[in-house]
Amino acid sequence: MTAMVMTACTGQKAEKVEATQDNFNYVVDQFADLQILRYRVPGFESLSLKQKQLLYHLSEAALMGRDILFDQNCRYNLPIRRALEAVYTGYKGDRTDPQFVALETYLKRVWFANGIHHHYAEDKFVPGFTPEFFQTCISQVGASALPLREGQTVEQFVAEISPVIFDPAVMAKRTVQSGDVDLIRASANNYYGEGVTQVEVEDFYARMKAGKDTISPISYGLNSRLVKENGKLVEKVWKVGGLYSSAIEKIVSELQKATAFAENDAQKSIIGKLIEYYQSGDLKIFDAYSILWVEDTASDVDFVNGFIETYGDPLGMKASWESTVNFINKEATKRTKVISDNAQWFEDHSPVDKLYSSAASDVYKRQGFAAIMVRNPLRSRISLRHMTKLLREMVLMMNLSGAIRSAKD
């Protein structure tokens, strides 16, 4: 919005535009240990209408997946968030009451972190309001505004979620990755069903991988929740017609609309392959989509949408849903290219010991890599971590480069 206002004022005096820039307020809000910032989007107005329409539908697709991540982080995240939102919008009391202010801060933290655990430390938030105040607030909210299960009363709902909010021992950490414990049972995340143990998960996927392709394997378990049904482990795949179908159908709908505004055939193929993957849940199609995505260095608009990173799973198998949408800032790219072209000069004049110099290699001459980093800093670390074949080739290239440097030394 600010970018559009500034562009509309280009006919006015430069000092007025400069004043507008100086008065731009980057800080939206500040609470707990967080400061919420907003930024200008330079270059947006220079995009074509078609590119803006593409960005719009890709951004809408990103918004459609929000609740998937909430649910993946903890099975109580959505019920708690919706209950807090109902209280926040319907509260009739004094909004300056310290108890309500604390509840508001807690809700904001939940919004920011996509759940009741800290976005970085992953420890559960400590509410600054009391269980009694929370119960009073809930009692003032109509049952129709609460996320009650069929047949569940308001009292039963409060009794179920209160320990999750207030008891520090219940679901204390989103992802437990160390210690002499069952990592699955100790973690609060929702990638595995109740009663599923770490040993069972490891055995399940070991059997699934046995005798399969080891050169270019798929990312087993990447897009599914492992649950027990009648005592048997079953994968519930995240796809159209599967788990999270309602949200994924909306994502697919926006991606289909975006296809009409693709910048080129390659980008159209990328979006089409992603749609095919969402509809089938086939991880081989995900690999094909990922390869197409990595190969596209011509499009100005870029995006990530899907189950990508596995940091949320203590076993590093299940992927959390995420989406980013971006486009090339061509002026910033020119500046970055100047730095990249002169990277060797910066290294030569840095205080780093020459022992660690890369002068013997051609690392700064690989313009493709520089272009990738300029396009989207996330590109090199998103997607590739799950494509074993590409990772293996990349590691091989790094090892060869290191060997060449060692030989020259």
Annotate the PLM regions.
Residues 29, 36, 385-409:
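Active-site scaffold of zinc-dependent metalloenzymes
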Residues 360-367:
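Conserved small/polar residues in nucleotide/adenosyl-binding loops
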Residues 19-218, 222-236, 240-260:
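N-terminal helix-rich structural modules
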Residues 251-255, 267-275:
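Segments forming glycine/polar-rich beta-alpha architectures that bind adenosine-containing cofactors
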